[in-house]
Amino acid sequence: GLEETAFYDPANFTYPAGAYACEVEVDPDTGKVSVERFTAVDDFGNVINPMIVTGQVHGGLAQGIGQALLENCTYDENGQILSGSFMDYAMPRASDLPLYAVDHSCQTPCTHNPLGVKGCGEAGAIGSPPAVVNAVINALHSGGHTHVTHIDMPVSPSRVWAAINS
């Protein structure tokens, strides 16, 4: 039969750059975290279709916020996954997410490809977990809980409450 094998190994890769800011509210009595605002600013080079790029960032932000606050795989002592269905694996709902402020107007063309584009597909999912966790730590510090310097993901209400009361 007909077979074809091809490889693409560019001499230089194309990496986007971005900055993410998250504002959260933390209930110190329960440890519940709610994301109030999220701003994502990225340089994806020349943007061919802004609507698709914005959608990619929105989806990535939802994934990252879910990873930071909710998603957790648990296993038994034999390595069998215990959180393998939507009944016991938490993901964010639309009501858990804020309206995002997304900006990709800074378009520094990439010099390593003819279109001047950079990847945008996973940017939101990469920058958002640390932005959320750092916002939680900052909110706790602002509330007088300066002893809290780290909380493992997911930053669940029980983990936040335990950190506050440690």
PLM feature segments, named:
Residues 1-166:
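C-terminal catalytic domains of large/alpha subunits in multi-subunit enzymes
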